[in-house]
Design a protein with these regions (language model features):
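Ribonuclease/tRNase effector modules and their secretory precursors
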Residues: 1-106
Length: 106
């Protein structure tokens, strides 16, 4: 099966074929992110990492920015041709040196 593409992700957003997992919604609230900001990040972002299918399907990490320049990471997956937002967060040290670079693993 082919890797996810940013165009596939954007197509699902544009056609309202996406779901937000409970975990992603909890993390969104914890980081004070709106669904609109997450959408902005996905529509302007790029795929940073692809993850192997470990039994839950294909997934990838997208990095994008809000209109105000706030970085957001979104782990995206697939279920029945729908985009699943698995988790969302603001990348910060020590896990990330920058929005594009992993930091030291603690």
């Amino acid at each position: 099966m082919e890797e996810l593409s940013i165009q596939w992700i954007r197509d699902r957003l544009d056609s309202d074929r996406y779901r937000v997992s409970r975990h992603a919604d909890d993390e969104r609230v914890a980081d004070n992110l709106t669904l609109s900001e997450i959408r902005q990040a996905l529509l302007t972002g790029r795929i940073l990492e692809h993850y192997a299918d470990t039994g839950r399907g294909r997934s990838c990490l997208v990095v994008g920015f809000t209109n105000e320049g706030k970085p957001i990471h979104v782990v995206c997956g697939v279920r029945a041709d729908h985009l699943i937002l698995v988790t969302v967060y603001i990348p910060k040290p020590p896990k990330f040196r920058s929005p594009y670079e992993r930091g030291d693993r603690a």
